[in-house]
Amino acid sequence: MSETVLPSLLSKNFPETELVKLPSSLYKRLKTYLDYKDIKKIQKAYTFAFYAHAGQKRNDGSDYITHPVDVTKILLELKMDPDSICAALMHDVLEDCNVQKNNLSKIFGKDVADIIDGVSKLGKLDMQNIEERNANNLQKMALAMAKDVRVILVKLCDRLHNMRTIEHLPRKKQIQKSKETLEVYGPLALRVGMQDIRAELEDLSFKCMHPIRMEILESAIKSSSGGRKKIVDKIRKELKSHLKANDIENAAVKGREKNIYSIYNKIKRKHKPFSEILDVYGFRILVDSVDDCYRSLGIIHNYFSPIENKFKDYIAIPKTNGYQALHTSLLALNAFPIEVQIQTRSMWATANMGIAAHWGYKTKDKNQGPELRASKWLSSLIDLQKKSSNPTEFAESIKKDLDSNEVYLFSPKGEIFALKSGACLLYTSPSPET
């Protein structure tokens, strides 16, 4: 879009009567938690994007504006703040529409312009081809993310929608994007605690790269779950009944499904047949308080047989991405093995929404759980950049950091240590008493 086409739109005094009506699917969600003033600002952002992308089409032939609208819908599920919503609607205008950042800043504020600029820099990266120029872009991206974690949120939602519609790209591009998503954006979502988005990104990428394997696993899971549904339902009801009988009134007991890509990786990692991987069924217990978490643990251990060395306390010491829960494995009906995760509802929200769970419209405290941890990780990227001798070394270090898994060590004294995968453990026997 040439900026001379819509000079009036680049003015703060653009009349409200000229604003393009928001799609009803957006407006209905916005009015559930935002006020009139914020919605009007978002409507102006939509108007800007609508005219900026006028005449542009997506690969499937649809109007381009449908993409930022669908990205915004994903972000609205997280109930993000108005600036994030505005940035999502306009996230492609710098790259695709000849719009200048300083004009966005004048109209929508510096935060919105900086988020869009950060998302644009992320979009220019090719993580499969780390060369000097691309590594320089990665440095700029790390700085943008460290300044405002909302850059990551908008970009993850952008990538998720692109993966949902990836079938319209050439096959070579599909493979490239899927590989990049598995290696970069999935781990990035994990780093900031966005578990639901991470799971969908992984499954969509896996389906694109290995459609036959995906089909086989989906079919096997469907046939397997049908035969055991009665047992699972019976265990769920028993768990609920025991908790209620012991005054845990508001407990919710749900089945816990693993995403297909994680099942596939578990089969490869453990070298076990599919039937053994699915022998263990997962349940999640949601309660109101931390005290209820530990009480619930004692109750279910009293009625079912705990499996030795299968208890983990991530409430006492959370994972680095903010995840908190009690994990235990039990032998239920007829020695049927089950895995149980116990969380407060707040912990569950954090586990699924990550930094967005505490960003929300009304919560602006960046010193809370997952946001603080994400900010610390992003700040560590800046330290990494300073220690790297050149941009390429920095880019390689980031890829290794995203790819690294953590191993949690539980000591006999109940201490929990987070170690990098591959770390060596040295055991020193206690000195004899003198």
Q: What is each stretch, according to the model?
A:
Residues M1-G282, L286-I338, Q343-I416:
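Active-site helical microenvironments for divalent-metal-assisted chemistry
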